[in-house]
Amino acid sequence: MLGSYGKAPSDADLKVAAAIECIHSYSLVHDDLPAMDGDLMRRGKPSVHAAYGEAEALLAGDALLNLSFSLLAECACYGGHYAHIMKLVADRCGAEGMIGGQALEFETDLRTADAARLTEIAGLKTGMLMEAAAVSGCIAAGREDEADLWREYAHKLGIAFQLRDDILDRGSGENSLAGVLGAGAEAELDGMIADIDEILLRTGGNSEFLRALTSAMLRRTTDEV
């Protein structure tokens, strides 16, 4: 993100990036727990709870979340926009964002959910974490005037990312956004990618790298990221 605006990341910027990655990792560790998705494998290896037990997995996730905010607090000590970024990340990954999306998923009968509900869940569970990353980069680059564009980009990217996951996982037998869309799922994804490209072209930075990265994410042939 910073590179697209021609800026090199500072040490504080790298800590923000590491903090967001810690949040992503903690969310995967907790999502894999038996009380959540119950997945035994993650990235081709046993998930944390499968390898070390549920208690260790719960504590590992908690530790990663605390580490993320320790890193963000270090950045906030610099003042300026880093305190704003810390609040942004907390909001997007909390009850009204990523965690709220997980809760909404548990409240939903996924066997009968329609496309609108599944899209809402994806926008919260995945899109909000992506928004935290994208808008943080925008703020760090000094281009907060483009924050709305990056929010739109992240929201659409989160939904498209989930749709690609669903397309790759069609054989699981679970209801999903791809399942609801049926034969039109690939065309819907193509339309989302076109929309995302158009948003990137409207930003003031060099969008070539981010367009290539987005395409790689949404054209991937594995659901492991």
Region annotations inferred by a language model:
Residues 1-225:
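All-alpha prenyltransferase/terpene-synthase fold signal
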